[in-house]
From Swiss-Prot:
This is Bifunctional protein FolD. NADP(+) binds at residues 166-168, 191, 232. One of its GO terms (molecular function) is methenyltetrahydrofolate cyclohydrolase activity. Keywords: Amino-acid biosynthesis, Histidine biosynthesis, Hydrolase, Methionine biosynthesis, Multifunctional enzyme, NADP, One-carbon metabolism, Oxidoreductase, Purine biosynthesis. Catalyzes the oxidation of 5,10-methylenetetrahydrofolate to 5,10-methenyltetrahydrofolate and then the hydrolysis of 5,10-methenyltetrahydrofolate to 10-formyltetrahydrofolate. Pfam families: THF_DHG_CYH (PF00763), THF_DHG_CYH_C (PF02882). PROSITE patterns: THF_DHG_CYH_1 (PS00766), THF_DHG_CYH_2 (PS00767). CDD domains: NAD_bind_m-THF_DH_Cyclohyd (cd01080). It catalyses: (6R)-5,10-methylene-5,6,7,8-tetrahydrofolate + NADP(+) = (6R)-5,10-methenyltetrahydrofolate + NADPH; (6R)-5,10-methenyltetrahydrofolate + H2O = (6R)-10-formyltetrahydrofolate + H(+). Pathway: One-carbon metabolism; tetrahydrofolate interconversion. The keyword Oxidoreductase applies. Belongs to the tetrahydrofolate dehydrogenase/cyclohydrolase family. It comes from Cereibacter sphaeroides (strain ATCC 17029 / ATH 2.4.9) (Rhodobacter sphaeroides). It comes from the Bacteria.
């Protein structure tokens, strides 16, 4: 058996098209333009690429894009003052502070200074708590993208066994909460889990978000399972740098029913869900119905 390849790039394009339709409807029906502000401190090369991609896609779906690029030596007080201005700016519906921040800045303090209603990354402690207690929240983008693909592929997730390998605040924990919200039976596995392969083999849904290249092999996969690979790792192979996931695609694809590739799987969904979250935040701020299917 060879697994179905879940094309995240194509799925993300569909999400962006849906967001663009809803943005056009907001403009025509209500004169409202959703706005996303992205804050970058310093000159980290990867962060600069991400911020550029976010700004480009924001404009492509018809939203207003506000980029704030600050020098690496920006003080905490200066950054917090900018966030306060953005919190009170009615043209800004979503705010994203690009991580990682320079070492002298307290990331938790900065993130928790955001207006939770504008926290489109879903990292504010209020949104974390709301997600954990089943209340309406802003949902972290990568887990939301995974959930969208799972819903599309499987339909109902109720009653399925799900194993999330990884317990980070950014992916593992919120992914487990989202799956629990779909009435899955959820196990969170990690570096201290005993007999990890056996735990994973019990999963109808296996989400790998552990940050170790090709750690999850076909031996970890239940026949017919759906495998979502969140990992993005750069490795040297045959004298070349290659991007691989946390799953060994070749062996896992021989066992799984469906699997996301790396690259081209979960990655493209992250920015698409950032745009979806900005749209959701805009609708909530204006007391308008949220578009269906674009949030948890």
């Amino acid at each position: 058996m060879t697994a179905k390849r879940i094309d995240g790039k194509a799925f993300a394009a569909g999400v962006r098209a849906r967001v663009a339709e809803e943005v056009a409807r907001l403009k025509e029906g209500h004169g409202i333009v959703p706005g996303l502000a992205v804050v970058l401190v310093g000159e980290d090369p990867a962060s600069q690429v991400y911020v550029g991609a976010k700004g480009k896609q924001t404009v492509e779906v018809g939203m207003a894009s506000f980029e704030h690029r600050l020098p690496a030596e920006t003080s905490e007080a200066e950054l917090l003052a900018l966030i306060d201005r953005l919190n009170h700016d009615p043209a800004v519906h979503g705010i994203l502070v690009q991580l990682p921040l320079p070492a002298h800045l307290n990331a938790d303090l900065v993130i928790n200074a955001l207006d939770p209603a504008k926290d489109v990354d879903g990292f504010h402690i209020s949104n974390v708590g709301r997600l954990g207690t089943g209340q309406k929240s802003m949902v972290p983008c990568t887990p939301l993208g995974c959930l969208m693909m799972l819903r599309d592929h499987l339909g109902t997730l109720s009653g399925l066994n799900a194993v999330v390998v990884g317990r980070s605040n950014i992916v593992g924990k919120p992914m487990a909460q989202l799956l629990l919200g779909e009435s899955c039976t959820v196990t969170i596995a990690h570096s201290r889990t005993r007999d990890l392969a056996a735990v994973c083999r019990g999963a109808d849904i296996l989400v790998a978000a552990v940050g170790r290249p090709e750690m999850i092999t076909g031996d970890f996969v239940k026949p017919g399972a759906t495998v979502i690979d969140v990992g993005i790792n750069r490795i040297e192979r045959d004298g070349k740098t290659k991007l691989v996931g946390d799953v060994d695609y070749a062996s896992a694809a021989e066992v799984a029913g469906a699997i996301t590739p790396v690259p081209g799987g979960v990655g493209p969904m992250t920015i698409a869900c950032l745009l979806a979250n900005t749209l959701t935040a805009c609708c909530r701020a204006n007391g308008l119905p949220e578009p269906q299917g674009l949030t948890a």
